[in-house]
Curated annotation (Swiss-Prot):
DCTP binds at residues 101-106, 119, 127-129, 148, 162, 174. The record marks 116-117 as: Important for bifunctional activity. Keywords: Hydrolase, Nucleotide metabolism, Nucleotide-binding. GO terms for biological process: dUMP biosynthetic process; dUTP biosynthetic process; nucleobase-containing small molecule interconversion. Pathway: Pyrimidine metabolism; dUMP biosynthesis; dUMP from dCTP: step 1/1. The keyword Hydrolase applies. This is dCTP deaminase, dUMP-forming. Its EC number is 3.5.4.30. Belongs to the dCTP deaminase family.
Length: 196
């Protein structure tokens, strides 16, 4: 079930959803707007010949901090990591979905490339996968509305929520734009093992 503004407000009051800092003006009819921090991770395109998700590549990205009164210019075809200002914490019976803002989508800004789902039990700032598919550069201002979170009630609380020892929760407690940790617990099925 998708939560309405009434349900989101009640979940905030009951601390089933925790948003820090919380601004009541960010509450929408069925979502909560989130804002862009001033930290970005840029890809070092000349450091590696390719990206290998199975291997650690610590120098693949570098952290950049933009002054509060300055914009970060995202060029056409460029892909960077950003972060929300807000730290988001979810109870074991709520999940969330990150969606872009319609007005920014109409300018060619992608807020996330594929990873818009936030598991129950997650706590941390949300890393944004920002891409410019327009033909002109886009200015990204720290503090601007960058997306919205929709919240969903689970049919029952998760037995092993994000952050539990059973899950490979690589990003629990993340602060700022967090580079990929895909090499940790990397899984690749062997076709002979799965009967293909």
């Amino acid at each position: 079930m998708l939560l309405s503004d009434v349900d989101i407000q009640a979940a905030l009051e009951d601390k089933l959803i925790q948003i820090d800092p919380f601004d009541p003006q960010m509450l929408q009819p069925a979502s909560l707007d989130i804002r862009l921090s001033r930290y970005f991770r840029l890809f070092n395109n000349h450091t590696y010949a390719y990206i290998d998700p199975a291997e650690p590549q610590e120098a693949l990205t570098r952290l950049v901090e933009v002054a509060e009164n300055q914009a970060f210019v995202l060029h056409p075809g460029e892909f960077i990591l950003g972060s929300t200002c807000e730290t988001v914490s979810l109870s074991n019976d709520l999940a969330a979905r990150l969606e872009g803002k319609s007005s920014l989508g109409r300018l060619g800004l992608l807020t996330h490339s594929t990873a818009g789902f936030i598991d129950p039990g997650f706590s941390g700032q949300i890393t944004l996968e920002l891409g410019n598919v327009a033909t002109l550069p886009i200015k990204l201002w720290p503090g601007m509305k960058i997306g919205q979170l929709c919240f969903f009630q689970l049919s029952s609380p998760a037995k092993n929520a994000y952050g539990s020892p059973v899950c490979a929760s690589r990003y629990q407690g993340q602060r700022g734009p967090t580079a990929s940790l895909s090499h940790q617990h990397f899984y690749r099925a062997r076709f002979t093992e799965i009967g293909l």
